Amino acid sequence: MSTRGVATRKNRYFDSVFLMAVARRLSEQRGVETAAAVMGSPANKKILIDMGFSGQALDLAGPNDLVVALEGDENAIRAVTENLEEWLARPKSELAGGMAISLDDALSRQASSNLAVISVPGQYAAREAHAALDHGMNVFLFSDHVAVEDEVALKRKAVDSGLIVMGPDCGTALIGGTGVGFANVVRRGPIGVVAASGTGLQEFSCLVHRSDSGISYGLGTGSRDLSDAVGGLSTLTAIDALEKDPETAVIGILSKPPGESTLRTITERLNRCSKPAVACFLGLVADSLDGDARFEVCATLDDAVAAALRLAGTDASEIPASPADQSAILAKGEAERMAAGQMYVRGLFAGGTFCYQTQQVMRRSEIIVHSNAPLDGMRFLGDPQTSIGNTLIDMGSDEFTVGTPHPMIDASQRAKRIAAEADDPQVAVLLLDFILGYNASADPAGDLANAISNAKQVASEAGRHLSVVASVCGTDGDPQDLAQQEQTLRDAGAIVFASNVRASSFVRDIVLQRAEVTG
Amino acid sequence: MATLRSLMEDGPIAINLGLVEFAKALRDQKKPAIHVDWSPPPPADQEMQDILDELL
């Protein structure tokens, strides 16, 4: 008979990635059925209570306290809780090269520090970022849930000091060939990028690399920078820097649509920029710029890459390895193999920008989709756990990541959702993104290969043909090996494309075919 | 005292607070990165800090 136990440690902080690894190792112990290791935030405690855990230790745990919850054989649980410290010890190799006890201690060891990389919980992030700026460092602020007034204060302070705050909610930067955060191994080249979206910058830089060109600098700004509340403070700083940078020949700007007045500010700034520029404001209605722009405005990341390459005058090869020219024929072939009633796409995305961009591809063909992050004109998916018709889900959004790592690191939620979608006889095609590079999962394709092949098999046994379409954002230099990742997906039965736009266009063709067949 | 320009010219010389993986990835790219063993301020300190922030 199984039992439940909860152990806590007061004022012991561990990050969610480390705790995920602890929970995974615990759950592999003989006799342990369920294991969770989280900080005792209200949201995490609610998840544990919903899982059936209870008791005084859990009730008293606060956000600064560690909570380990276990279900299974009584002896197994006792063995873990009596030796909890051993389970919480970090491998010594992780700390090779020195660890400081504070920002001041770190600065005393490395006085030339020029960048603070901050990923602490959001409520503490602004204070740490202010301290870094006060010490004369630029800031890469990965943390989210930072108040917008804190963001504005930080960015104003940075402007006054000739520094930049990349973030909050900044996933990626490329600083002269070095990736910060979630970044790919990309060669240096003539194209400089300013990006409000981490995955947008990753996709753009990978496609530039795969076209034999390169990136001078990719400066993140955080997802809210071009809102009217923030006014593009970091974007303007980054444009100034890239305009002065001798290595940069072309400047690309990637973002969701800016606020109205910020769009005017950015348009005016790019119009007087001495270097050619390309803007991709995903989801922007075309006439919002009123013909004012004296720079290229592109609807998709792929179009922006093509424009930037052309403006840079590079002799770039076309983005390789996609059966694009045969795409429509292949889509028709896939659609013809499907059973009556198979009509819809279910897109399960690790990258929020990909969820957004796929909706844009669908909107152009007047295909209505439901999403937890809907583009203008699309429908809001009230319960993100339950798909309706065509559904595209950003699985990196808050409702999926409270208490668990991002799907770029941990594929378990996507694996479960793939299985659920495969059981739905109305589903024609699954659309998935795979993001390689530093700090992503060591094997993103391998993490979901079984889920993909099982989904296809379940559908097949029910007399259906389920298409699985994937895009892989990565380069040949990435630690995960792009070619191997693509092959793993093909072996699992997926059709693989080199970009999200190409995969989305293929899926759109299938959906249109199925709508035609089923009337 | 760094600037954005010096970051771009010298490359990242980083101090990392939070996910240790970010420091490890920089070191994998042969860039200096010191990881800070960060933990949240105790709740009492937090309240006091908020009061000080208000006053200052």
What do the predicted segments below correspond to?
Chain A
Residues 2-519:
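Catalytic-core regions of core metabolic enzymes
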